[in-house]
Amino acid sequence: MTHAHITSWLITIVLFFLAVSMERQGAGKAKIVQMVLRLFYILTIVTGLLLLHSIASISALYWLKALAGLWVIGAMEMVLAAEKKGKSAAARWTQWVIALAVTLFLGLLLPLGFDLF
């Protein structure tokens, strides 16, 4: 399940950058990419919940990582909304980067992640 989760969030990030790029160019198919992106949000959340459910003893850090993961998805939607409205998205991009960094740090720190820290 770990590989499915990692694959889903990697594809989600790629689709996010593609959606932002297409929105900036005013491409008509940007809406389709955003809908596929939202499908991958759901897939990422479901695989994350399945991973969380498979842990025997869930510490507070796992719940914090789950909340940080939801924060990443929320920040992605805020960036896309700002880009669509033509508003400045600098603060939203900063929020997304911070949320992603926190989530990746916790993911690598916890036992289900890789042994980097």
From Swiss-Prot:
Membrane topology (UniProt): Multi-pass membrane protein
Pfam (any one): DUF1516
Transmembrane segment boundaries: 1-21, 39-59, 60-80, 97-117
GO cellular component: plasma membrane
Cell location: Cell membrane
Alphabetic keyword roster: Cell membrane, Membrane, Transmembrane, Transmembrane helix
Superkingdom of the organism of origin: Bacteria
NCBIfam families on file: PRK13673.1-3
Similarity annotation: Belongs to the UPF0344 family.
Name of the protein in question: UPF0344 protein GK0697
Organism this protein belongs to: Geobacillus kaustophilus (strain HTA426)
